[in-house]
């Protein structure tokens, strides 16, 4: 079995972001702080935004999305989110808020390299 590492870069009402690293894939879960803060935190764990394969958004609250637009567009990182989150986040359907955007049903599974990401329902505090 391949090694999987997870780092909570930021957690709390001021912003959330988790970094996941496997043998051939590096992912973010949420981007609730600025792109600059995410980049700095990634450097501290030996990575960078240039190495991120994709970002998975858990839901549309600002403490999970604050840096999303810049991370997506400037760093060309695909974003995966559920259709309900996209509807809540992107109020103007013609807006180009994000670059590569992949919409999924609430329960989904995505394979990137040797890593599979599966969503699951959980209550929000």
Residue ranges of model-derived segments:
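Single, functionally critical "micro-switch" positions that shape active/binding sites
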Residues: 29, 58, 123
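Active-site metal-binding motif and surrounding structural segment of the metallo-beta-lactamase
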Residues: 36-81, 85
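Metallo-beta-lactamase
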Residues: 83-125
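A generic hydrophobic-helix recognition signal that picks specific residues
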Residues: 23, 52-54, 117
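Conserved beta-strand hairpin/beta-sheet module of binuclear metal-dependent hydrolase folds
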Residues: 1-45
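Short glycine/proline-enriched coil/turn segments at helix->beta-strand junctions
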Residues: 23-25, 74-77, 95-97, 113
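Structured catalytic core of nucleotide-sugar glycosyltransferases
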Residues: 7-17, 59-64, 79, 90, ...
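Beta-strand->loop->alpha-helix junctions that form or flank phosphate-binding loops
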Residues: 10, 54, 101-105
């Amino acid at each position: 079995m391949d090694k999987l590492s997870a780092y909570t870069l930021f957690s709390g009402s001021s912003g959330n972001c988790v970094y996941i690293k496997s043998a051939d894939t590096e992912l973010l879960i949420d981007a609730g702080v600025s792109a600059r803060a995410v980049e700095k935190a990634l450097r501290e764990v030996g990575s960078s935004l240039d190495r991120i394969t994709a970002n998975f958004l858990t839901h549309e609250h600002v403490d999970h999305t604050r840096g999303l637009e810049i991370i997506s567009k400037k760093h060309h990182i695909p974003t995966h989110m559920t259709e309900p989150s996209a509807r809540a986040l992107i109020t103007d359907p013609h807006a180009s808020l994000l670059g590569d955007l992949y919409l999924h049903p609430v329960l989904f599974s995505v394979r990137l390299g040797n890593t599979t990401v599966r969503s699951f329902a959980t209550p929000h505090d």
